[in-house]
C-alpha cells in the first residue's frame, strides 16, 4: 500500500511540474543542471528523496543548481566546514531546496524557495551521536551570473555571484534539459507521512546517516595538517 501511495504521489508531482511559472528576462543559456568540478553533487533523485525524507551523501563536497525554462530552480549542496581549533571536528552539511527564480532587469538572479520544502542534514561528530535533520529554506540573491565556454574543459561554465559579489565555486553544464525532482511544492503532500519527524525544531535522524557522514571527520584526521576545508 505504501508503495502504491509513493507511485501515485510521484506521478502527481511529476505531472504538475508542467504547470509552469512565468519568468521575465528569460535566458535560455541558464537552463539545465550545473555542477561543481567534482560532479559528485547533482540535483535530482540521486541527492534527495522527498517521499522517504532521505539524503544520499555524495562521495565529495560540491554544489549543483538546476534551472527550467519556465521559472523553477533546484539546488543541492554538500558542504564541509572545518574547526580551526579542533581539526578533528569538521561539520558536514547536506542542503536541498527548490522553488522559483526570477531575473531582474539589472541581471540579478533571485531564488525563492517553496517554504517548508527544503531540508538540511547537519553532522558534527564531536558534539553529538546523531545527525540533525531540519526544514530549510533560504532566499538567495545573486548579484549577477555569468555563462561562458571554458576553453580548458571545453564545457559551458556558470559562475554565480552572491548578493555581496562573492563568487561561488564555478559550475559546469551537466544536463540539458535539467535533471530535477518534480517542481511542485511537496510540503502539503509530506505533512502526513512526516508529521512525527517535525514535532520539534531539531530532530535526531536515524543512526544510518551518521555512519555515512563521519568518514569526513576520519578522513581529515588522517590528513592531519589541514587547517580548514570549506566548500561554499
UniProtKB/Swiss-Prot annotation:
Signal sequence extent: 1-21
GO CC terms: endoplasmic reticulum; endoplasmic reticulum membrane
Main location: endoplasmic reticulum
Keywords from the UniProt entry: Endoplasmic reticulum, Glycoprotein, Membrane, Signal, Transmembrane, Transmembrane helix
GO annotation, biological process: 'de novo' protein folding; protein folding in endoplasmic reticulum
Organism name: Schizosaccharomyces pombe (strain 972 / ATCC 24843) (Fission yeast)
Family membership: Belongs to the ROT1 family.
The protein's name: Protein rot1
Membrane topology reported for the UniProt record: Single-pass type I membrane protein
Positions of transmembrane segments: 212-232
Parts forming coiled coils: none
Pfam assignment, any one: Rot1
Subcellular localization: Endoplasmic reticulum membrane
